[in-house]
């Protein structure tokens, strides 16, 4: 069930904590900043951590990554997720590039069925907010609940965000 455009927050009035074995934190990180945020989320939630990697390394990162985003490409990716169906809550993390998520995130979202799952986006960025990158979740995961995302500029923001979402 998708939320309507006027309601951007997920139902956070949970009475039971999430089951750690049903929480997945999947992320793409180029410099390690997003990876650090993902590791902190995993430590706080007890969830399973999984990295997204581009199957073919970039030759010219800046030119190729920007072209992928601008042209809506979905490059081949590698992940070590064995059974996505087993997870109810999926955090998806990425750096912001050209005000968007890297193309590998679109590949991950397009290649999996998120019907009935809760997706919680988070990003890292020195200058841009998560807002402009969120459209891919609505477009590629129409049957999922998309929770409020977070731009992680400070690691101390993560725990209060998880508390606001009703996860901790």
What role is predicted for each listed range?
Residues 84, 110-116, 139-141:
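Short, conserved loop/helix-junction motifs that constitute active-site signature segments
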Residues 2-92, 99-101, 106, 110, ...:
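N-terminal beta1-alpha1-beta2 submodule of the flavodoxin-like/Rossmannoid cofactor-binding fold
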Residues 92-93, 121:
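Redox-cofactor binding/interface segments in oxidoreductases and associated redox assembly factors
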Residues 96-99, 114, 125-129:
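Short Gly/Pro-enriched loop/turn and capping motifs at secondary-structure junctions
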Residues 112-123, 146:
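Short, acidic/small-residue loops that bind anionic groups at enzyme active sites
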Residues 123-156:
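Short, glycine-/small-residue-rich phosphate/pyrophosphate-handling segment
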Residues 20, 44, 114, 141-144:
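Short, well-ordered coil/turn elements that cap or connect secondary structure elements
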């Amino acid at each position: 069930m998708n939320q309507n455009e006027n309601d951007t927050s997920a139902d956070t009035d949970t009475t039971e904590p999430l089951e750690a074995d049903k929480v997945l934190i999947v992320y793409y990180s180029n410099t390690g900043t997003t990876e650090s945020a993902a590791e902190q989320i995993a430590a706080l939630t007890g969830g399973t951590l999984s990295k997204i990697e581009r199957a073919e390394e970039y030759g010219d990162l800046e030119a190729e990554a920007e072209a992928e985003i601008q042209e809506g490409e979905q490059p081949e990716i590698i992940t070590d997720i064995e059974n996505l169906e087993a997870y109810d809550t999926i955090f998806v993390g990425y750096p912001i590039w050209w005000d968007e998520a890297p193309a590998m995130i679109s590949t991950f979202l397009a290649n999996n069925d998120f019907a009935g799952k809760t997706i919680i986006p988070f990003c890292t960025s020195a200058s841009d907010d998560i807002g402009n990158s969120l459209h891919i979740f609505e477009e590629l995961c129409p049957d999922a609940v998309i929770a409020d995302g977070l731009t992680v500029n400070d690691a101390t923001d993560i725990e209060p965000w998880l508390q606001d979402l009703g996860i901790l």
